[in-house]
């Protein structure tokens, strides 16, 4: 499961910083569970705001 791209702009993240963080990525079932949980809540949050936006237009 992949999170939607929520970063504000491409120049916001320094590629050197991203490479450093990539080396610290946790591995294992708990990391996968955490990743899926974060993706779930990001998706739910986006759907909630889309619903609010749609209800404000009606």
UniProtKB/Swiss-Prot annotation:
It comes from the Eukaryota. It is found in: Plastid, Chloroplast. Its main location: plastid. GO terms for cellular component: chloroplast. Keywords: Chloroplast, Plastid. The keyword Plastid applies. This is Uncharacterized protein ORF58. The lineage of its organism: Eukaryota, Rhodophyta, Bangiophyceae, Bangiales, Bangiaceae.
């Amino acid at each position: 499961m992949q999170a939607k791209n929520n970063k504000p702009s491409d120049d916001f993240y320094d590629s050197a910083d991203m490479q450093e963080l990539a080396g610290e990525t946790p591995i294992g079932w708990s990391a996968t569970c955490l990743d899926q949980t974060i993706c779930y809540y990001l998706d739910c949050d986006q759907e909630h705001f889309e619903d609010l936006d749609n209800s404000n237009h009606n």
